[in-house]
Amino acid sequence: MADSSREENVYLAKLAEQAERYEEMIEFMEKVAKTADVEELTVEERNLLSVAYKNVIGARRASWRIISSIEQKEESRGNEDHVNTIKEYRSKIEADLSKICDGILSLLESNLIPSASTAESKVFHLKMKGDYHRYLAEFKTGTERKEAAENTLLAYKSAQDIALAELAPTHPIRLGLALNFSVFYYEILNSPDRACNLAKQAFDEAISELDTLGEESYKDSTLIMQLLRDNLTLWTSDNADDVGDDIKEASKPESGEGQQ
């Protein structure tokens, strides 16, 4: 497999996606990414890489939330033996999460961000960098959490600077960045006002230019706008403290070319 061409690895990644073998999908797309030192990934390639990692990390994030919820219930009941067992099990999931995040962050730093030449590609990969530092911040504690949060903020701000200057307010990648950046403010930094302001500004700016939206990205853009509005409704409601699990974030790559 080491000598497989870039095209063959892309095709194998598509097969792995159809078979829902996402760990293997990552392996194939990492090979592609490591050959993209000079030439950046195509829209299709970066979306395949994103989908692969999103599925692998998503399953572990869901597992971590379930186990953490059980841990809280057992703590409230005073079941110390169970709590200790759960903590050990949770640490295994956290080790998995760390390994996955470290893998994509290393790839982004060494290959993907340096080779990105278009504004769209730069924002896509910087957003991705912010996303995976944010996933680390979700479960890390102490100085590690602080460092992960700082890295998230830096990546999202770098992406935002380019997006605001180079991408239209209706561009799905710009909207997806605003969505995930606002979730970061709300969930990680506990700044609901900043989260709401960022989400509202992105939504309002996109609404004002909706008539300029091309047919190819209309579906992607309006979907993310709906998610922004859903979060705003959630965050400004009286019972926002009780509905953390319902917060929406960009779960699919926003290609700008209608590829979900």
Swiss-Prot record:
**PROSITE patterns attached here?**
1433_1, 1433_2
Report one GO cellular component. cytoplasm
Compositional bias (Basic and acidic residues) at which positions? 245-260
The positions making up the signal sequence are none
Annotated region (Disordered) at: 238-260
**GO BP:** protein localization; signal transduction
Looking at the record's lineage, which domain of life comes first? Eukaryota
Q: How does it assemble?
A: Homodimer.
Q: Which family does it belong to?
A: Belongs to the 14-3-3 family.
| Protein name (record) | 14-3-3 protein 4
Q: Give the species.
A: Solanum lycopersicum
